[in-house]
Amino acid sequence: VDAITAGVDIGELIAKSLTQDWQPERFDLADLLDRTFAAIRRFVILNHQQLNAITLWIASTHAFSASQLTPYISVTSAERGSGKSRLLEVLMRLVANPFNSSHVTASVLVRRIARDRPTVLLDEIDALFKGNKEKAEHIRGILNAGYARGGTYSMSEPVGNSWEPVDYDVFSP
């Protein structure tokens, strides 16, 4: 909590802890994870297991480029006002390179992932999957391909007077 209010970039600290030049006498990963856990708990009501899972998921967003797979997290509730949006606000401060959208097209999502490698935070995705089936299937396809290194999503792009298939790398948390 102190790190967030003091303007310290917790994500940067997590990333530094995972590099070879990490100096344990100057940084304690367990302490950072504890502080991250406490920061989330300060703003969102979750049980201990949920807090642990989200804390570790946040850490994973800072290390995904060193892995073959990246986990996704889905936050759902049957009740309005349960704190999903508040959790999203907290995640936007703690994850690596956040990209938050409540209304995104497949075209935008593919290009943002390929260009920026963001942590994708999709608000109200349950409404998307209940709505336009074609749009939902495109987003689902991107997510299904993007959890693994080398995952691609193909789109047609204009080239001159015709269209050519282009494979986009969509590996991103």
Stretches found by the model and what they are:
Residues 1-2, 47-48, 101-107:
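General structural signal for secondary-structure boundaries
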Residues 1-46, 129-132:
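Replication-associated primase and helicase/ATPase modules
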Residues 12-17, 43-49, 65, 95-98, ...:
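Short, mixed-charge, low-aromatic patches
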Residues 29-32, 36, 54, 87, ...:
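Alpha-helical structural motif
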Residues 32-71:
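Pre-Walker A (pre-P-loop) alpha-helix and adjacent loop at the N terminus of AAA/AAA+ ATPase modules
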Residues 62-173:
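Conserved NTP-binding/hydrolysis core of motor NTPases
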